[in-house]
Amino acid sequence: MRCPFCGHDDTQVKDSRPTEDNSAIRRRRSCPECGSRFTTFERVQIRDLVVIKKDGGRSPFDRDKVLKSLRIALRKRPVDDEQIERIVNGIHRRLESMGENEVPSKFIGELVMEVLMDLDKVAYVRYASVYRNFREAKDFEDFLGKMVVPRLD
């Protein structure tokens, strides 16, 4: 595998093990040229998913995009990287199990919202603020008003 730091074509695998949920193989690699170390993941790909965007455009499903958006929403929250990886794997498996090759971006966003609602309410609101394009404080207020949580009195 090519080194992402110097571009050298031949890197060495130093450690290889399954992820916690056995959905991928995690490999630690090092580059003999520049000495950099990095991690790669090997996953099964059942089908090539295509995302249908709001404007009608189509692009290949990018699990890293989902991973990045979850990491942003969950920044400084009590959720570790392994748990985030499991969430992304679960979303990806759910999309593949639908049997459809094309999936609307809105559906992916709703899946992420569903997971975050159960996992962490703060991350849920953070994600919703970007996903639903909040522009002002009133948008947050309206959204939070719909999230009424019963109080214990």
Curated annotation (Swiss-Prot):
Keywords for the protein's UniProt record, in alphabetical order: ATP-binding, DNA-binding, Metal-binding, Nucleotide-binding, Repressor, Transcription, Transcription regulation, Zinc, Zinc-finger
Keyword Repressor among UniProt keywords: yes
Domain of life the protein comes from: Bacteria
Zinc fingers, unnamed class: 3-34
Cofactor notes: Binds 1 zinc ion.
InterPro entries: ATP-cone_dom, NrdR-like_N, RNR_NrdR-like
Stretches assigned to the ATP-cone domain: 49-139
Gene Ontology molecular function: any one: DNA binding
Required co-factors: Zn(2+)
GO BP terms in the entry: negative regulation of DNA-templated transcription
Biased composition (Basic and acidic residues): 7-24
Pfam families for the chain: ATP-cone, Zn_ribbon_NrdR
Region (Disordered): 1-26
PANTHER family from the UniProt entry: TRANSCRIPTIONAL REPRESSOR NRDR (PTHR30455:SF2)
Family in the record: Belongs to the NrdR family.
Protein purpose: Negatively regulates transcription of bacterial ribonucleotide reductase nrd genes and operons by binding to NrdR-boxes.
Annotated NCBIfam families: transcriptional regulator NrdR
Protein name as catalogued: Transcriptional repressor NrdR 3
Species this chain originates from: Paramagnetospirillum magneticum (strain ATCC 700264 / AMB-1)
